[in-house]
């Protein structure tokens, strides 16, 4: 139930939209998709209860199966949501090296926590992992987020029942 895209960005949005309209989750390695198309596609996915992973998402693990540019790690009970492919790579390999395992690593694309996108996929993925019985722990990894968007994500994380480990890479001192 996942369509994977790796095509030139100028052709990506219509094809991804078609996949979403056919009730498929989208994993988009495709980059150079406009921010307007990204927001539109992520809103459509949200409305349909689907995940729009990307655009510019090269790393993911779905049901312990690596997708695209991803290391093979042990299956397990940790769910990862990441707006940083290299962050997902690093964290999932550390989890594996320390004896743990990953059930899902949901890449969102690096712009998901920007003001314009508003963490649509990050929030949907957190809720999905909260409701996913095999997931016992949730990890969130992000490139530097927009402050207001980060605050919304943190508020959501504080409201869920599962333990959470979160890192917002490169963020300056919050002073709060």
Predicted feature descriptions by range:
Residues 1-176:
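Catalytic-core regions of core metabolic enzymes
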């Amino acid at each position: 139930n996942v369509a994977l895209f790796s095509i030139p960005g100028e052709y990506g949005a219509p094809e991804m939209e078609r996949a979403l309209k056919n009730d498929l989750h989208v994993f988009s390695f495709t980059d150079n998709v406009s921010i307007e198309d990204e927001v539109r596609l992520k809103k459509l996915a949200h409305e349909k209860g689907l995940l729009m992973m990307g655009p510019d998402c090269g790393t993911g693990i779905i049901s312990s199966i690596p997708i695209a540019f991803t290391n093979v790690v042990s299956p397990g009970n940790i769910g990862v949501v990441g707006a940083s492919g290299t962050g997902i790579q690093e964290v999932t390999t550390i989890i594996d090296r320390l004896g743990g395992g990953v059930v899902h690593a949901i890449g969102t694309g690096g712009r998901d926590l920007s003001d314009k996108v508003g963490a649509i996929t990050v929030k949907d993925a957190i809720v999905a992992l909260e409701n996913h019985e095999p997931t016992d722990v949730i990890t969130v990894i992000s490139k530097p987020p927009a402050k207001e968007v980060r605050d919304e994500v943190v508020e959501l994380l504080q409201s869920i029942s599962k333990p959470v480990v979160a890192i917002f890479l490169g963020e300056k001192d919050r002073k709060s």
